[in-house]
Amino acid sequence: IMLILAFTPLGYLRIGPLAISLMTIPVVIGAMILGPAGGAVLGLVFGLTSFYQCFAGDPFGAALVAMNPFFTFLVCIPTRTLMGWLSGVIFKALWKIDKTKTVTYFVTGLLGAFMNTLFFMSTLMICFGHTEYLQSMNATGANLFMFAVAFCGINGALEMPMSCVVGGGVAKAVSVALKKNAATEEK
C-alpha cells in the first residue's frame, strides 16, 4: 500500500511547492498493529520514498537536494522513522491507560500526523530556514517562523483529521480482525 501511495499522486497531494502526505496513515496503522519497531520500519519506507521524490520530479525536494543533499536526507528519513517509532510507543503507552481500548487508536492516528508535520517542518527550518529559497517562499515578508506555523496549520488541518479517522478506524478494525482470527485458530 505504501509503495502504491508513494509512486502515484495518491500519497503526496501537491499544494503549491509543498505536499500534503497521506503516507502517515499506513505508518501509524502499522505502528499500532506491529509496535514501535514495525512503525519505525514503515516510517523508514515513508522516509526513503519521500527522499526518492526529491530526485523524481518534486520541485521542492529537488531544490533542497541541490542546496544540500545531506540535509535533505535528514529532513526526509530520520523524521519519518522517528514518527513511526514514536507512534508505536505512544500507542503502547496509551493502551495501558485507555479503559475503552478505542480512544487509543484515534489519538495515536492524530498524534502520528502531528509528529510528522512537527518533525519535518522543524528539521526543514533548522536545515534550510536560512536559505534564500525558503526565505523567498515567505511571500508576505513576515517572519519565516510564522510562515512555517501557517503552513503547519494548513497541513495539520488536512493530515491530522484524516490520519485520526482513517488511521484510527482501520487500525481498530484490523486489530479486532486479528484477535478474531487468533481466537479461531486456537479452537
Regions found by a protein language model. Name each.
Residues 1-187:
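Loop-helix junctions at membrane interfaces
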